């Protein structure tokens, strides 16, 4: 069986149920080994005309057959059925609970991992952990623990019975077993390695398929269906080859076990027949001995299956352990406080930041203050560091001490949950869940009423679009919201953030897909609905932020200027150049449309 720090706790947690299953297993194995004795009685009764029962020699009559053989056999079968049902419920039920608990632990750990982890590890690979690898662990925990105890208990009991009948014959029968044990150990190591390769190949295949399904529109637009099919075939072929290799090893192990069983039977028949010829065994005793050996055939087969399942289980557990051992880079420090009654002030104080895997500082000596109730725009060319500011405010990454303050308190002294709870966020990708529009808008507020959802949709200027849908707010969106337009996705995302009514609202380039008229309506609604609340708006178009209280202009990770639009246009040449270029682009676009 497999053991490890993430599995042992579940063995202990399910110990009472497993103990009950083990007791049922012991009962079944014990009474199962009574059956060969009845074989002896029947054979000797037929051959000799009499049987020895409890030290008494009795004539082999129908009454004796019924009383001492048939009725006890019926009771044995009934008890075996009850016992097997009981231990299956105990062992397999525990396996299901272990898998559920482990999957829940994985999910709980996954949600605490930093954004950097998800940038390195692909979704398809992670999903295979929750499906294939968890299923393997469940199979190993259920079937594996059953096989282990059944093979151990039944095998030892049967060997004891065989040893008492004739130890020399038993020693001869054990020689192939020792050889088989050595071969199985070597092959088990090889199977563990191959199973890890198999799971990784499946993960790569799943990840490739997931990316293709998500990006099918792009693939079709660039007419790359055939190219992607060829790439999929290559990965699928690799997956097939690894599976074939693993299957060959597993099949070879099964063949060797069968060879071992047949070899032992030959030994028993040969030497056992000799013992009968010598008069040391009678025919009934030889049949009884073979019955005991038949009882350990299952443990022998179970050993090969156990080697395979354990090899697979260890490989899957190693992959899951990598996830559970992944460090939680962004976490609360001991003794943090909750952010009580947040007002919405934000201050960056000489902050310099580099992404964990970055080669240069994306933000350099950033200092500015946002007072409660202010509406602030952050502009700059692509790569200037605008989104990095949002990442730090939302504590997606660790923040250097003494560089970021919310309501005058260092964010490192506040719980991450309370800081994020004080913010409402509209991300660049405008992610939507594959759920109804109502659930998407109400995601950030528990038990949001239909009236609240409708009001938020009106503020985001998307209500008219929603009511035009056949099912209105109950319209189910496709994966990541693919069934609505880019502008509708943005406005639904904005409605979701507005419904939360948080002290701090962050919009990361969140009106880029709407026209200027709709943009003006949304910005006017933001201004009227968020009086005395802080709004932070990251934008590429200057027209989006020019009416805000102040603008922070970033250039190559540094603050170039801070102030209202008119002031920056007059005092900052780089800002003025950006404004003029955008105006020229707008005018050129207008001429082209004309």
Enumerate the predicted regions with their spans:
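Membrane-integrated ABC transporters
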Residues: 1-35, 47-72, 86-91, 95, ...
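Juxtamembrane loop-to-helix connectors within ABC transporter transmembrane domains
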Residues: 2, 91, 111-155
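An intracellular "coupling" helix at the cytosolic face of ABC transporter transmembrane type-1 domains
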Residues: 12-13, 115-116, 132-141, 145, ...
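Transmembrane helices of ABC transporter permease
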Residues: 13, 17-29, 76, 143-197, ...
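Alpha-helical segments in transporter systems
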Residues: 16-41, 69, 73, 88-92, ...
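Helix-loop junctions and hydrophobic alpha-helical segments within the transmembrane domains
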Residues: 106, 110, 219, 320, ...
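Helix-loop-helix
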Residues: 161-175, 245, 249-318, 323-324
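ABC-type nucleotide-binding domain
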Residues: 332, 339-594
